[in-house]
């Protein structure tokens, strides 16, 4: 995967493709509309995509909760590209952006099937999270950076 590039979506067309990718992987399978992607942090978030051959294959979003704490949301890797290190690289890039902007801690709400992935990246379990609008069990995890 020598041609993998992580970047912020470069224009409106690519942002629309990014939204469609996020929705297709994370929200459509549970019956949510594409509009359900947008929350109060959307416009002030750091959005990152992983691109191979001009195709989005991974995504993640980071926003700041306060001056020292950031939250990662909407992390996903296309099934065809999973278990090749893209998720780990995406996570590292989001963490790096948080650290570069003075975050000391990152939190996230992991779907249960992703807990092992985040634990391997040194995230610690805090508690079960019950605030998700997805109906899917999540666990709040944290990491000092």
Residue spans for each PLM region:
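Anionic, Ser/Thr-rich low-complexity intrinsically disordered regions
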Residues: 2-97, 101-121, 126-145
């Amino acid at each position: 995967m020598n041609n993998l590039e992580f970047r912020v979506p470069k224009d409106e067309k690519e942002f629309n493709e990014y939204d469609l990718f996020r929705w297709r992987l994370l929200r459509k399978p549970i019956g949510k509309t594409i509009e359900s992607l947008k929350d109060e942090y959307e416009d002030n978030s750091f959005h990152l995509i992983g691109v191979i051959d001009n195709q989005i294959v991974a995504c993640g979003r980071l926003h700041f909760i306060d001056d020292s704490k950031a939250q990662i949301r909407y992390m996903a890797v296309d099934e065809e590209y999973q278990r090749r290190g893209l998720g780990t690289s995406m996570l590292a890039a989001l963490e790096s952006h948080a650290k570069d902007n003075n975050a000391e801690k990152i939190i996230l709400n992991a779907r249960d099937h992703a807990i092992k992935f985040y634990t391997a990246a040194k995230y610690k379990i805090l508690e079960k999270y019950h605030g998700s609008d997805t109906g899917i069990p999540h666990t709040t995890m944290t990491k000092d950076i």
